Amino acid sequence: MTSTNMISNHTILASAFKKESAVFAVDSLITALTDNGDLTFGDLGNKTSSAALMKLDHSMVRPKTGHYAPKKLKNGHFPSNPEQFKIPEYLVSQLDTIFQEFVTLTSSLPINEQKTYWSLMLRYCFYLRNLRGEGKKERLLFYYLFEKIHAVFPKTAEALVPLIIDYGYFGDLDHLIINIKAKDVVNAALSTYAKYLNADCLQVFGKELVAVTIEQAVALNNKLKAMKVEEVQEFVKGKKLSLAAKHIPREGKKDQLVRKLFIEHAFPLDDQKNLSFIKQRFRYIITALTQCLGVGEQMMTTSGKAGSIQRDWASIEMDRAPAGFLAQHRSALLNEIKNTPLTQAELDTGNRSKDADRIQCRKNLMKTILEGKLKGLQLDLSKLAREIDKHVKSNLANLSSAERSMLSAQWKDMMTKIKEAVDAAVKAAPSTIDPRNVIPVIDLSGSMQSAKVDVEAVALGLMGASISNLPGCLITFSEKPTILHIDQTKDVFAQFQQVYSTEMGYTTNIDAMYRKLLELMVANKVTSADFALMILTDGHFNSGLVTIPDGRDLKLFETVFLGRMEKAFKEHGYNLPRTIFWNLDARGAYSATETTKGVQMVNGYSQTLLMSVFCGEYTLTTDELGNTRVDVDPWTSFLKSITNERFNPVHQMCLATKEGCFA
């Protein structure tokens, strides 16, 4: 089939979505469907290390119910007690079982294969944490897995600690120092802090941390305090400073134990005899380094006081401010009192402070929003989506126009950056089948709401619909499916509202979804299924379990959802479209096996996981039974993600330790 015909088909289908979206569908083809009454796969395949690793990923999904949600202390900070931040016991037990299964299966393999699979496990560990590029952005689950790996490969885990900064951030070191009891890991984390702070001090002071005197630190502090933003930027020009000074805990603040242990680690014992003096010297050094970084929090005070930093709220450069900083201080930067509507007279100034610099800060922020320069890519999609959802479900009652614009701008930046990355990847590796021909399918059944993952499903679905070659096309389903065409000219709040206008909270009738889609395809004379279905779900449309070792038992296969869908598509003259099962809730049943052709599996909430769906080189393949599918399977797709060159340093470090199977 020519590319012209393929483009024509997905264009026709996109047009059909637009027409159909005005009418909510009523599926007359289903006569009866019990809630969670279908069969599914009980395992990802035969007992192999690859299947165990994929099972681990399937369960490495941050639970949204019954998990860490500690209350703030009186000082406004969260407690550092590790018991307050933990993975639920049921999930720990589940993960423990799967990890041990991997260990047992891998230990029985030849040494070269052991090396291969343990290298993949360690790559996966850092993929689990990866904040930049494709990865799951998970903290607690990464800490859990890192500790499990340390129990098997202590020397290797210790050697990998410095790499954590490349995939996570300095706060991860704080967790290791406080919560992991192994002294080798704690020392490695403290040494990593020292390495970066020494490098920063060499650039700023011309000497390492312990050689900087209090007089030098005070002098530079005073000099920097008097500088304007542009002058500070000129001072640090050409210097590559880390964020260690920003993240190392402050005295009297959360995780201050890290600071105490670091001082004991970094400074000679003789110096520590006058500990109060060392603390004071260290404080001045860190303050100077933080000023060099242009940290926004330091400017969130009105200048003019003797000895204070002469950079105020108006000095914050909104187009350079990190997405997390903007999200955390959104109301303050907008100069708005939370949940207090602005009067007409306050629209330009805000209603929180009358200080000139606070008002200018608001104006600067609004200007940056209008120019489309506000950052949002690195935000936690789940947190951003839940903030949007909160306002949508309260009918936007306490949402100011400025806050709406700010949240929408950060959403748009996130979407735009992912689309740019996807387009660049596709251009670099053209595919016979364009991987961007994707239709998101959002499960809005009652179980999604019970698991509290419905908001994440909507967010990922809308994000996917925005970067797809079928822009705005998506399907929602509960008992009945709804064909939607999301207006891409509307902001994300309006898009959420459009999705929420459909049927929600009933049973999980996924069969009605593909039947409705087939009706649409046939009615509009679409000649091929040259698209992918990205199904965002908790997987609870199945309850019973069936074990199909290789997926070749046709009668059994036709009883599971994937088999039923393929049969229905074939009856209408279509091949099974590439199908992505996006799992949003850790559970023990699977919608396919690791080798099922035409299928991919994605697990988690990170927006960057969309890269594995919208990128890749795909062709068609026909098996001995005559089934034509896209030539991809869950294991191959997963393997491609974790063997990305970004994780090569992890593999190289494993080989360098020569520990166990890496010898």
Language model features with spans:
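Long lumenal/extracellular ectodomains of secretory and single-pass membrane proteins
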Residues: T2-E456, S466-A663
